[in-house]
Amino acid sequence: MVKLRLKRCGRKQRAVYRILAIDVRYRREGRDLSKVGFYDPITNQTFLNLSAILDFLKKGAQPTRTAHDISKKAGIFTE
């Protein structure tokens, strides 16, 4: 199963996150299938590749709660 989840990057006390499509069998820092976004909680910047995210969601990928919330704020899940 593929999930959309966050991977921690950056330095101590200055975390930034990449939003990845990754197989659930791999750990958080493991091998990813694709990088689909970026999130910086300190400056509140978000970059999302909408076409890649929608493509993975159509194929059955499940976002984690945090990845879902970030995507929802960006307007992906407008229903």
UniProtKB/Swiss-Prot annotation:
Q: Name one GO molecular function term.
A: structural constituent of ribosome
Keywords, ordered alphabetically: Chloroplast, Plastid, Ribonucleoprotein, Ribosomal protein
InterPro entries recorded: Ribosomal_bS16 (IPR000307), Ribosomal_bS16_CS (IPR020592), Ribosomal_bS16_dom_sf (IPR023803)
Q: A GO biological process this protein is involved in?
A: translation
Could you state one GO cellular component term attached to this entry?
chloroplast
Q: What else is known?
A: The nucleus encodes 2 genes for bS16c that can be imported into chloroplasts in vitro (At4g34620, AC O65686 and At5g56940, AC Q9LTS6).
Q: What is its main location?
A: plastid
What protein name is recorded for this chain?
Small ribosomal subunit protein bS16cz
Q: Where in the cell is it found?
A: Plastid, Chloroplast
Induction profile: Transcribed and spliced in green leaves.
Q: List the disulfide bonds.
A: none
Stated family: Belongs to the bacterial ribosomal protein bS16 family.
Supply the Pfam families for this chain.
Answer: Ribosomal_S16
Listed SUPFAM superfamilies: Ribosomal protein S16
